[in-house]
């Protein structure tokens, strides 16, 4: 039990889920009583939603002040991020509606503990577009954080980030404080994620005990559907963008294969960030472009997370028979265009933003998160891998658009004519 294998969170969660399935199947009544473990984990995740989004967005925007190529490069990068992440959201929405992996589960939302999401209970109501947009503006900043309204926190974070950016060197102290606070928050998240096996065990034992083994088949359909969607997105969407930019997506994937293995092992695209900065520069992208696009992309260009968010949200609606008409789905898309920008490339961040998004939409049962808690860890690999490839492609595209890409060097490196570690570098 003390071997390195059992120290892996991935193995721990896998083991916990297996135990939860067995307990729920053979002792359904006892399995159903394990529900509080899953609820407790969800509450712990909710506890850090507001601060993690605030810190991530503020440091992401204000952090641009230390980079030279902010102007045109920043505008092009943000435009690219918005367009491609929107495409990812739409693709996820379309496929989950076509495949309908949650249809037939017939989960009664009333059996899901609403107390676990009491902070957002008052938002569970329909409202018009005008009322929805006005609700984004908080009555007070403290109130936004106290109520856990993610859109209000996000709006304040964006304004705060831009204001801090305009202060320049005068705001460096504040930036450093927020960045340090952000590290503390992510430290808390890491501690919470260590409890993921317990939460996954409780959620899976309850789900199987309450709804039977057939539920696992439905959850398996969601996992398979999500992985296939991510593969199609990388090959078709990112592949087409890469081809239009002048390189092969398959050769690019081969080039960053070591970074992909790191991400696969950690389920976090952030774990490969330092290596990606170096790799993209050696590929032929100017250092100033790499320094701006890669870090910013970890908050604003998470394609895999975008696909996950739409698919998971609609899956919960299908599983709980919560009707979502075209207005509700458009509202979900609009909310995700905002809230998905607050997801950092770390393990568990997708689940955090999903919880925030569902609560902000106000139409889906937030307690329904317990349905996918047990499998979220297994979807994180596809999220992280897609995010990493997406940010790499974005860097090359932006570099070419702003004419800061050495196309010959990129071609030589991708075709193994010049070793990446010996290719010449472009200085900023």
Curated annotation (Swiss-Prot):
Stored SUPFAM superfamilies: Proton glutamate symport protein (SSF118215)
GO BP terms in the entry: L-aspartate transmembrane transport
A GO-annotated cellular component: plasma membrane
PROSITE patterns: NA_DICARBOXYL_SYMP_1, NA_DICARBOXYL_SYMP_2
Cell membrane among keywords: yes
Keywords for this protein: Cell inner membrane, Cell membrane, Membrane, Symport, Transmembrane, Transmembrane helix, Transport
Annotated transmembrane regions: 8-28, 44-64, 76-96, 142-162, 184-204, 222-242, 289-309, 326-346, 352-372
UniProt-recorded Gene Ontology molecular function terms: fumarate transmembrane transporter activity; malate:proton symporter activity; succinate transmembrane transporter activity
Subcellular location(s) of the protein: Cell inner membrane
Protein family: Belongs to the dicarboxylate/amino acid:cation symporter (DAACS) (TC 2.A.23) family.
Function field: Responsible for the transport of dicarboxylates such as succinate, fumarate, and malate from the periplasm across the membrane.
Name of the protein described by the UniProt record: C4-dicarboxylate transport protein
Organism classification: Bacteria, Pseudomonadati, Pseudomonadota, Gammaproteobacteria, Enterobacterales
């Amino acid at each position: 039990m003390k071997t390195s294998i059992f120290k892996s969170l991935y193995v721990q969660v896998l083991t916990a889920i297996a135990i939860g399935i067995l307990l729920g199947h053979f002792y359904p009544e006892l399995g159903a009583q394990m529900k509080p473990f899953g609820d407790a984990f969800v509450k712990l995740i909710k506890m850090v939603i507001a601060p993690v989004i605030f810190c991530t967005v503020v440091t992401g925007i204000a952090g641009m002040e230390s980079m030279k190529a902010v102007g045109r490069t920043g505008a092009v990068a943000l435009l690219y991020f918005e367009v491609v992440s929107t495409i990812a959201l739409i693709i996820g929405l379309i496929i989950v509606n076509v495949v309908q992996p949650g249809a037939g589960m017939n989960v009664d939302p009333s059996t899901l503990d609403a107390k676990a999401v009491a902070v957002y209970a008052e938002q569970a109501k329909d409202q018009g577009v005008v009322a929805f947009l006005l609700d984004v503006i908080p009555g007070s900043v403290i109130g936004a954080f106290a109520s856990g309204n993610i859109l209000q926190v996000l709006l304040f974070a964006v304004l705060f980030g831009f204001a801090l950016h305009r202060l320049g060197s005068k705001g460096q102290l504040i930036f450093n404080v927020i960045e340090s606070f952000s590290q503390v928050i992510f430290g808390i998240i890491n501690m919470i994620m260590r409890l993921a096996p317990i939460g996954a065990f409780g959620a899976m034992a309850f789900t199987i005990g309450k709804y039977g083994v057939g539920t696992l088949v439905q959850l398996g359909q969601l996992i398979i559907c999500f992985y296939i969607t991510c593969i199609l997105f990388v090959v078709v969407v990112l592949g087409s963008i890469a081809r239009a930019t002048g390189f092969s997506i398959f050769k690019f994937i081969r080039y960053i294969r070591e970074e992909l293995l790191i991400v696969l092992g950690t389920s976090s695209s952030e774990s490969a960030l330092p290596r990606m900065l170096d790799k993209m520069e050696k590929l032929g992208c100017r250092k100033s472009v790499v320094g701006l696009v890669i870090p910013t992309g970890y908050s604003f260009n998470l394609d895999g997370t975008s696909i996950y968010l739409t698919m998971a949200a609609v899956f919960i609606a299908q599983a709980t028979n919560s009707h979502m008409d075209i207005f509700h789905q458009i509202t979900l898309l609009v909310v995700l265009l905002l809230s998905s920008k607050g997801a950092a490339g770390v393990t568990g961040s997708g689940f955090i933003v999903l919880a925030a998004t569902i609560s902000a939409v106000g139409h889906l049962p937030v307690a329904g998160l317990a349905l996918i808690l047990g499998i979220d860890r297994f979807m994180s690999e596809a999220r992280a891998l897609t995010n990493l490839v997406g940010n790499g492609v974005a860097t090359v595209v932006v570099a070419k658009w702003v004419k800061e890409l050495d196309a010959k060097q990129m071609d030589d490196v991708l075709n193994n004519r010049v070793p990446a570690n010996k290719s010449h570098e472009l200085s900023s």
